[in-house]
C-alpha cells in the first residue's frame, strides 16, 4: 500500500484555523498499516512517519521515490515558445509554484520571499512574474483567499498571479516558461 498523504502527519502540521483530519481517517489508515504485508513510502521521512506515527514494522516499509513522465516533461521547444504559449513576456523573471494550495507546501513562503525581493531589489519588480498554479485542497478553500489577501497586503498583487489548476497537457509549458520552479 502507498499513502498519498497521512492524516497524522497532516494533523501535526496544521496551520492556524485548519481543522484536523477526521478520526475515522486516522483509524482507517492505522488498520491499513496493521494489515499490510508491504508499505511503500516516497521518502525516508515518510517511511519514518509510518513507523513512528502508525507503528508500522520497519521491515515491511520500502522507499520507492516517485518518477517523472519523461515523455511529457521534456525541454520541448524551449523557454521562448513556452512563454508565448502561456502568455508571459520573453524577458520576464518567472518563478512558478504548481500544486494544491496547502500551508505545508509553502506558497506563503514564496509570496513573502517575493515581497522581500521586490523590497530589496525594486528594479526587478517590472520583470518579476510569480505564478501560483493550483486550487484549494479539500474543504480548505479559505487558504487561497488568505494568500490573495496576504499578496495584496504586501503590495505585490502586480507581481503574483493565482491561477486555477491547468490541464496536465499544459503543465510542461508552464514549467518550461519558468526560470525557477518552487516545490
Summary of predicted features, one role per range:
Residues 7, 20-39:
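Membrane-proximal helix-turn-helix segments that form the acceptor-binding/catalytic region
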Residues 165-166, 173-178:
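Short alpha-helical donor nucleotide-sugar binding micro-motif in glycosyltransferases
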Residues 89-105, 111-114, 131:
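Conserved donor-binding/catalytic core segment of Leloir-type glycosyltransferases
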Residues 45, 67:
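Carbohydrate-associated surface elements
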Residues 127, 134, 142-169:
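Nucleotide-activated donor-binding/catalytic signature segment of Leloir-type glycosyltransferases, i.e.
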Residues 1-11, 39-40, 62:
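Active-site proximal beta-strand in glycosyltransferases
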Residues 37, 176-183:
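Acidic donor-binding loop of glycosyltransferase active sites
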Residues 20-21, 74-88, 147:
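A short helix/loop element that forms part of the nucleotide-sugar donor recognition site in Leloir-type
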